[in-house]
From Swiss-Prot:
GO terms for cellular component: endocytic vesicle membrane; endoplasmic reticulum lumen; extracellular exosome; extracellular region; extracellular space; Golgi lumen; plasma membrane. This is Protein Wnt-7b. Palmitoleoylation is required for efficient binding to frizzled receptors. Depalmitoleoylation leads to Wnt signaling pathway inhibition. Ligand for members of the frizzled family of seven transmembrane receptors that functions in the canonical Wnt/beta-catenin signaling pathway. Required for normal fusion of the chorion and the allantois during placenta development. Required for central nervous system (CNS) angiogenesis and blood-brain barrier regulation. Gene3D superfamilies: 3.30.2460.20. It comes from Homo sapiens. It comes from the Eukaryota.
Length: 349
């Protein structure tokens, strides 16, 4: 039985990396040897592996946050030629797209935000050691507005700092792509921080609101995804500035401008133009669009003309059958008719 438990824990870390482990079970995890477990997780950089070994409870929460980012990416781009489908197939950790494109910018931003969100939530729920509610938001009274800090405010700064230490640790090479990735990581975390919400509860006699107790909460991650998708649509192309004597990349500037104007901190930035994602190409992270569902009448990105890249589409017909017009008869049975509908779906050639 002990061997089966060891094997179960091992596959949780290695394959999924997305399940919470209650603090009471951590002794069993530590007993397995954090070094053994962390050395088996694919895609970790050396500094990330060190964090895993020192905080085996946190690596599972980090994995869940990274997976949440991948899921959100797939939702936001579900109607596009590139739909994030190749992300996370082997591991939720490590670099996924080799081209420094808009799509790479989005994946880095949404992953960094996902890790920060998951760590912050786990701290608030008591699922991580060494963190909890935001202590600085306890006991302060705002007399002018008639409210005070109370409850459990989400400590987003801890989550952001943990995301920064872990996610940014994979950027080892001193090149333009490193500057791009670090900027987009920070942009994703900044969007999350800016969307923190204030919730309040009234206190007073007979339902009056004499005073209010307030606390900060995390936004829904879908909201973060929508905002980052807007940032993706307005992403800024940048180029590297080599200001040191060693000619190493120092900072990024907006490419179209003659001045040394830096991008805004919440801008998503890219250094290479996106491929068209029509054909399968492992180097660009494209799985192609062959076999993808498309909308024959849509003029948008999900339309067959755009999705299929001019190759045309196949038409598939099938009959959908379901029970309908159900009525209750006394006593006591329900009688239904059988309805059917002929449906067509279209897939790219």
């Amino acid at each position: 039985m002990h061997r089966n438990f060891r094997k179960w824990i091992f596959y949780v870390f290695l394959c999924f990396g997305v399940l919470y482990v209650k603090l009471g079970a951590l002794s069993s995890v530590v007993a397995l040897g954090a070094n053994i477990i962390c050395n088996k997780i694919p895609g970790l950089a050396p500094r990330q592996r060190a964090i895993c070994q020192s905080r085996p409870d946190a690596i599972i929460v980090i994995g869940e946050g990274a997976q949440m980012g991948i899921n959100e990416c797939q939702y936001q781009f579900r109607f596009g030629r590139w739909n994030c489908s190749a992300l996370g197939e082997k591991t939720v950790f490590g670099q996924e797209l080799r081209v420094g494109s808009r799509e790479a910018a989005f994946t880095y931003a949404i992953t960094a935000a996902g890790v920060a969100h998951a760590v912050t939530a786990a701290c608030s729920q008591g699922n991580l050691s060494n963190c909890g509610c935001d202590r600085e938001k306890q006991g302060y009274y705002n007399q002018a507005e008639g409210w005070k800090w109370g409850g459990c405010s989400a400590d987003v700064r801890y989550g952001i700092d943990f995301s920064r230490r872990f996610v940014d640790a994979r950027e080892i090479k001193k090149n333009a792509r490193r500057l791009m990735n670090l900027h987009n990581n920070e942009a994703g975390r900044k969007v999350l921080e800016d969307r923190m919400q204030l919730e309040c509860k009234c206190h007073g006699v007979s339902g009056s609101c004499t005073t209010k107790t307030c606390w900060t909460t995390l936004p829904k991650f879908r909201e973060v995804g929508h905002l980052l998708k807007e940032k993706y649509n307005a992403a800024v192309q940048v180029e590297v500035v080599r200001a040191s004597r060693l000619r190493q990349p120092t900072f990024l500037r907006i490419k179209q401008l003659r001045s040394y104007q830096k991008p805004m901190e919440t801008d998503l930035v890219y250094i290479e133009k996106s491929p068209n994602y029509c054909e399968e190409d492992a180097a660009t992270g494209s799985v192609g669009t062959q076999g993808r569902l498309c909308n024959r009448t849509s003029p948008g990105a999900d339309g067959c003309d755009t999705m299929c890249c001019g190759r045309g589409y196949n038409t598939h017909q099938y009959t959908k059958v379901w029970q309908c017009n159900c009525k209750f008869h006394w006593c006591c049975f329900v009688k239904c008719n059988t309805c059917s509908e002929r449906t067509e779906v279209f897939t790219c050639k």
